[in-house]
């Protein structure tokens, strides 16, 4: 971590002459906050606990005032009632709170911020920094993202090519808790220092990036502790991950081809764990096309190759039951996981009505997710959204394990 910290400080020192020029400030531009407040009805929460008929309310507010020509604040916060599966009643979180200095060719952002990497459609193997809250009752997956405390420095080599360095404190996903076994011990969440680098080319017919991340995995990794053979425990720990990744997007007329690939070396961070590292390779390849003026169709294939998968076939008794349970906790169902994503969307009635239907097919486990969405804008402020998350498949499969999270919803929201 000393090397990464030295790198960030060196880049910051290089930026000092440019940042000094920013002191010729103009008057601040205190723009008004913007966001959305919503009232929703859901047939289930997202905590895997069979809860039904939930009324939720929440607001997502952003404010990005410019202090002068080179400095801007970024604030984004969420507050809600019954809108988070792991919390009953009121909940809230500051998702972003940062200050940004922009003095070309440097851009420096410090504070809590959402950092999203990857050009594929919603499945992004290289996206390792910002965690998600998978229990939030929101129709858009992007609203699940949470910020991390970080310093991000970007240097524009030329108008199309840039290099970005990030030094951050680790934070982790919020996941459903109701399905966790009672004999589980979870380690305390560490606050380790992490770093990442990305070389990015954008703004041309062929966009691409190469990135590297060294930090903690955002998901807990579970193992079985046989210290007491008569009462084995599940233990959840956080793993150190080094990940090398790349992505690309090629646009030609109405067509866009996208892809991502990442190779991760993941090792246990707990002293009592086995020392062997495991390796995971993930890839996505697909594309989308615009047609009939307002419609879009997207298709992708994806694959995950896992070195350390434990196949329960051939095991019996307690060992088989524990292995099946462990694989469900870690969402490990095959050494080679393959799947397909589909998405069709359209805008009609002068963009007042927007609909989308998306599906994810788990080809190994024969499970699937279907997620239609419909949004109607009465005017610039009032909006109605309805949708469905339907999961099905065997219990020992990715979407079969999420059946209790199947839900239908209707949301009335006010945009300001």
For each feature predicted by the language model, list its residue ranges.
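Detector for outer-membrane/organellar transmembrane beta-barrel domains
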Residues: 215, 249-360
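Residues that define the transmembrane beta-barrel architecture of outer-membrane proteins
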Residues: 51-57, 90-95, 145-149, 191-195, ...
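Membrane-embedded beta-strand positions of outer-membrane beta-barrel proteins
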Residues: 33-37, 75, 110, 153, ...
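Transmembrane beta-strand segments of Gram-negative outer membrane beta-barrel proteins
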Residues: 23-47, 55, 69-75, 355-357
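Outer-membrane beta-barrel "beta-signal"
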Residues: 340-344, 388-390, 402-416
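Transmembrane beta-strands of outer-membrane beta-barrel pores
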Residues: 37-43, 77-83, 103-105, 114-116, ...
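Repeated loop/turn-to-beta-strand initiation elements of outer-membrane beta-barrel proteins
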Residues: 69-74, 105-108, 160-163, 205-208, ...
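Outer membrane beta-barrel
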Residues: 64-174, 201-204, 391-393
